[in-house]
Each structure stands twice: as structure tokens, then as C-alpha cells.
Amino acid sequence: MAGQTIIVSGLNPAAILQSTIGGGASPTAAAAAENGTRKVIPLSRDALQDFMLSIITQKLQDEKQPFYVLDLGEVVSLMDQWKSALPNIRPFYAVKCNPEPSFLSILSAMGSNFDCASRAEIEYVLSLGISPDRIVFANPCKPESDIIFAAKVGVNLTTYDSEDEVYKIRKHHPKSELLLRIKPMLDGNARCPMGPKYGALPEEVDPLLRAAQAARLTVSGVSFHIGSGDADSNAYLGAIAAAKEVFETAAKLGMSKMTVLDVGGGFTSGHQFTTAAVAVKSALKQHFDDEPELTIIAEPGRFFAETAFTLATTIIGKRVRGELREYWINDGLYGSMNCVLYDHATVNATPLAVLSNRSNVTCGGSKTFPTTVFGPTCDALDTVLRDYQLPELQVNDWLVFPNMGAYTKAAGSNFNGFNTSAIVTHLAYSYPS
């Protein structure tokens, strides 16, 4: 499911994190244990670029293949931010966002649980030594074979939003606990809305609760998802209010007391996260302050993944048309850059002119030109950037793309024989500058 991980020699990872998290098992050690290795590179945060240059010059002189750098320090920082802003909400990381094994391992070591959407994702998480009680099978419409597998391995918490799903679960996994997935009335203007596909409408809540009750299934709570990427935090307010109404409806039907609220995903790091956390806590206080025993979970994906990964690509071709510069790189829309199409992402590139301008590899102060950057495949759709300003570069120079952890390699293909799954990941641990 994920590519190879390369660990570059450095200090003992347990020592690196000791002062950061204060004893106990080291998340970095857990991450580096993948493939039986135990070392990462400790860096100041502003030294990541130098680290990437060292990889380019020392490790990839001949291959010149694209690679990722996973900054474990950024992951630790993001988990600290989560625990500070939402201390009572336990994250179930959305595996679909980025299943890199070292990344999942460090999240697990720091206490994250996992949101899986398929048998394959469940198998993958279990293969990392993570117990099934730390998984929510958060797909409201599952193949029967996947439900059978979940029952077999002990994944006992799942979502539903249709009567047919009730019948499948009753038949194949009657001990499962259910979360009724509801549709938020506002999708938050998210780049990737979830409402058109998933979530019970208000008028469907009562029949769906009754269906589960008649099937003698336990409905433990409610889930929702306001959509992914740049969602309006106000959408949480209405969704949490609607969830409270479902709790009340279940109580009126004489069902067992609901104990779980899943506030879904849609969280983005930075200022938007701060705003979202305030909105979520405000709504929880307003609607669930009388539920002290309530377990609250969330399904963040991009919050943890997006800024932790940086992608480096090689320029493999060049064409000049007047002032226009056109470059081909060895990753594109059918690979890591599929986020441009499917996640509606905007990517940014930084040059590393290791061949053409070694005395000024970042090309600081250099003249820039309107530039088009193409991916490597033969499809004209495979265009990463248009009308983008870049300096004069040459074949075998590099373009580096930050913030490439969310819905990138995870959804890439091997179209035209360009093997996305073969892109390697190097590990580093950065400290704040």
C-alpha cells in the first residue's frame, strides 16, 4: 500500500524525542522501526532544504528519482497542537489520506487511533501491530465481504446511513456497534464535500434508528463529516446541533443511551484549525455539556499529513518558447500531483538548481519567467503548473513541492509505467528554529 522508507543515519531517535514528549516510548523510534532500522536525521526546521540537497547530491546522483521527506518533528508538533486545542477529542487518523507506514507508526505511538474505509486499510493498520479496538470502520456503505472480515478480526465500530447497511451488518456482524452517519445541513463550502454521497437526511433519522432497533443492533452514537479542505468552521455548529437531536430521538425510541459522537474530518492545520477548534468546543458545550460520559472522536486526515511531507522531483525535459519556459518533471497528475485534480489542491514549487546554478541553488534574486510544468505521462492533462514564475532551470535540476502529504501518493497510479508506489520516503526530525 505504501512505498519504501529510507532512514538516513543520524542520532538515536529515542534520545531525539526524549525532551520533546517526556519519557515513555518514542514515536520517532516507532516510526523508524519500520524495515528494522533505528535512525533518523535531527535537524533545525530551516535545515530541511539542506537535508534534501544532501539526498540529491549523495544518494540520487544516478537515479534522480522523485522522493519524499517526512518530517517527524512536524507530526509531533501537530499532535501537540491537537491535544492542546481539542484535549477531549481523540483523533482517528483517516488512513486514506496518506498510508505511509512510518507516518502511521508515529501517529499510533502518540495515541492516535485510525479511521479505515476498507478491508485493505484495516489489514494494513493491523499489520503495523495496532489493535482492532483502535479502528473505526468509517465507511457507511461496505461490501459484505469487508463486513465479514471486520467481524473476524474484531473491528467492532462502524458507520451506516441506510437500511440496506443495517441488514448487511445484522447478517454478518451483529455484535458491531453502529454510528449513524448524518448529513450536515451546511457542507462548509469544502473543496471536497461529502454530503452529496453520505449522510442521513433529518427525515431519515427516525426510520434508520428504528431499523437498527428492530435488527437488535446497538447504535452507540452519531457521526458526520462537514467536507474536506477549507471548510467553513461554522458547519460544525449546525452538525453538532443535529447530532444532539439524533441522541434525543434515540432516547425517545427507548434505545440504549448513545455514548459516542464522531465529529468527522475537515480539519486543516494553521489558523483554520484554531477557528475550527473554537467552533467545535463551543457547539459541544452548548449541546452536549450534560453528557459528561460522552466519548468524542474525530477523523482528521490532512491536518496531520499535509504539511509533514515534502516532495522533490527532477526536471527531465525543457522547452523554450519566447519568454515561456516549459519543464517536464518525473512526477505529475497521475502520481503524487493527483491532488490537483481530485483534492482540488494548489501546489507550489521551489527550485533547487543543483546542476545549473550550484553557487545559488535556490536561485535567489534570479530573473523569473512565466512557466508551465508538465508531469511525465503522455496525457496533455498532466499539467502541474501554468503561468507560474520560476527562474531559468535546466534538465537534472530539481523542483521541490512543500505540503504534499494529503491525498497525494495515496491516490497515485502507475499510468504510462511511471510507478508512483516506488517513490521512496526519507525521514527527518526537525526542531523549531
Swiss-Prot record:
Pfam families: Orn_Arg_deC_N, Orn_DAP_Arg_deC. Homodimer. Only the dimer is catalytically active, as the active sites are constructed of residues from both monomers. The lineage of its organism: Eukaryota, Viridiplantae, Streptophyta, Embryophyta, Tracheophyta. GO terms for molecular function: ornithine decarboxylase activity. It is found in: Plastid, Chloroplast. Its EC number is 4.1.1.17. The modification N6-(pyridoxal phosphate)lysine is found at residue 96. One of its GO terms (cellular component) is cytoplasm. Pyridoxal 5'-phosphate binds at residues 228, 266, 299-302, 407. It is an enzyme of class 4 (lyase). Pathway: Alkaloid biosynthesis; nicotine biosynthesis; Amine and polyamine biosynthesis; putrescine biosynthesis via L-ornithine pathway; putrescine from L-ornithine: step 1/1. Disruption phenotype: Reduced alkaloids and nicotin levels associated with a lower putrescine production. Occasionally, an early senescence and a lower viability of the older leaves is observed. This is Ornithine decarboxylase 1B, chloroplastic. Induction: Accumulates transiently in response to jasmonic acid (MeJA). GO terms for biological process: alkaloid metabolic process; nicotine biosynthetic process; putrescine biosynthetic process from arginine, via ornithine; response to jasmonic acid. Transmembrane segments: none annotated. It catalyses: L-ornithine + H(+) = putrescine + CO2.
